[in-house]
Amino acid sequence: QVPPMKTLNDRMGMKIVDSRLTIKNYSSLDKYNGTPLLGAYTIDAEGVVPPKEVTLVENGIFKAMLNGNIPAVKAPESTGSLRFSLSSRNGAFNLAPGTIHIKADKGTKPEKMKSALIKAAKEEGLKYAYIVRSLAGKASRIYRVDLKDGSETQVRFGDVTGFTLPNLKRMLGISSKENVSNFIFNGEVLSSMIYPSSILVENIEINKSDVKKDKEQVLTFPLQK
């Protein structure tokens, strides 16, 4: 009998991402390195003043989760994270972050990420590696990197699949440079994210219309448009 798969809630206190990563949620932080953060707020939909900072993941270990006033087994207290929906006219609200900060310890200089990609691919005996500059299904911007000279060729109609949380438990490289993005969480709540500009991972599937699946080293630029 196959044991049931663990949900994220079941992984409290366990390693879920690379040990170099710490993830925090900020509520009232309204600017980061000169960029306005649209996820900033001072009180949630239940009238709870959220803590300015909640550490969700520390050195890769799942420490806490966001919650409202209704206690949960893994989150007995509110983090002031029930927020009003942008589209609602009747006061509906959703559990949502303010600003998520994914911070890397001892990150790699951004100009060295590509050389790290090429080195890792050569060690695996591969002919090519791939750089993903945006994730958008079949419209993803994917570039094949020639390991001999580092030249890049755009892959047409590429689709990245198989990128899941386990891929983040052991990353080959994390950029020290950070990007800042504002977005609408689940199409309902203004949120922001601060995150490494690129990460180096392996065993990601690249689907193309004219070739079979390739499992190669991949350098991704998360959330970059």
Task: Tell where the protein language model's regions lie, with residue ranges.
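Dual-mode signal for accessory low-complexity, basic/Gly-rich regions
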Residues: 4-225
